[in-house]
Amino acid sequence: MKIKTSHLIFVQGILLVVFLFITAWFNRFSADDYLFIGRLRDFSFFEFYEKLYLTWNGRWTYNFAILFFMKFSEYKYFLFAFNGLSFLLLFYSIYLVLAALNKKYETNFNIKTVLLYAIVFIGVFFFFTHFTGQSWFWISASLAYLWSCIFFLFGLSSWLKQTHRFFDYLVIIVCCLYIGGSNEVLALLTILILFVSFFFKGNTVLKAITSIVMLGSISVNYFSVGTTFRDNLTPNLPFVELVLYVGYGTVKYVFIDFYKTILPAIIFGFPFFILGTKSSVQLYKNFNIKKDLFKTLIFVFLVVFINQFIVIYALGGLAPDRSTITSSLFSSLAIVRFMFLYGIHSKEIKINFKPALLIVVVLMLVFNGVFYRIHKNYSQSVDERTIVILSNNKNEPIRLKKLNNAGYLNSAEITADSTNFLNQHLKYGLGVEQQIILQEN
């Protein structure tokens, strides 16, 4: 049987899906997860929800979501089911966006192609994301970061429709509410884009409603007592230090970590170039590879810069990798757009894509094999540690061995300091009285 490029792209996508679900299978609770488990054991849902909003953060939609899901944490396969739900929602939201674009620009790709490339985009987004262990797999963070991106994509799919019905407005409103109450960076960047969009033609009513709802939601977040309390705990950087921190964060994201994130994302997204070469529609006739590549890079740089500025200004320190997922989403969309358009305007180039795709498939096979072993060993070490803690009846500190490498998962590792919040959360979540300490080698 003759192997087609579509077959290789399909295998590439399947290997990604296998990786995501196997990794989810080996996922374990970590850090703040144990705090939520303990609090929900000692307080009612609404007591703890009120406490979070008034004393810790104003992320009102995120707080509701995390408490809702963590009510099911006692079930054995809860984390696997949660991660699986996240991936399915992400897949469906991307599919809706691609389907809307397919209809809007009349590219006439069949549903199988749209479904396949929704998986390919997940791969681009995944590899573009810094520290996926926190923003994708760690439930305490993914509900704020990955899920806000999912809601953004659902809203975008409704926005892209040529005619907007009541249901589309409802979807957009719900999405804006969730984003504003969970991911401040994504909310502010969306508001900025909406502001710019008012200078162009379009549905003014839709723009106004979206802007008002997003502003309202983030206001409930920002002006909360909990957010004010948390802001008082973080330092205010002098202007020079702020510039240096933002500059370093931007350079690190774009250049220093290029080989770990952007390069793998581009390689995995190569099928979008191939898809462009097969398109029967000539989109963007003024496309110029140098100019449009420059515009794409400038867009990515600006998004990363704004993302870094918002987080660093608020925290008074370097931005946590999980907080850059907004940059990863917008950059993934920009890179995929460029590759597709480049493919459309490169139809005269006669290239055999199969060797390149075969290399990607082989790399994904190796990738799956390596990280299967890493994640399996990590999960076993966490399970063994949990057994040691729960079976210890001695009234003395419990000294634990170091966990194995967590790979793409968020590590549940603690410290040698029994008073560290990681140690205290683990102790509280498991309901033990003894101090828990990481044994120093």
For each feature predicted by the language model, list its residue ranges:
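Signature aromatic-anchored transmembrane alpha helix within multi-pass, membrane-resident enzymes
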Residues: 290-297, 342-367
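Membrane-interface micro-motifs in multi-pass membrane enzymes
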Residues: 32, 113-160, 183, 304-338
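Transmembrane alpha-helical segments
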Residues: 90-101, 149-160, 191-199, 271, ...
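Alpha-helical transmembrane segments
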Residues: 6-20, 116-123, 171-174, 210-216, ...
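Transmembrane catalytic cores of multi-pass membrane glycosyltransferases
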Residues: 24-84, 139, 180-323
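Membrane-interfacial, low-structure loops and terminal tails that flank and connect transmembrane helices
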Residues: 1, 101-111, 279-293, 349
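Short hydrophobic alpha-helices at membrane interfaces in multi-pass membrane enzymes
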Residues: 158-177, 205-209
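Intrinsically disordered, polar/acidic, low-complexity terminal segments
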Residues: 4-57, 70-116, 353-441
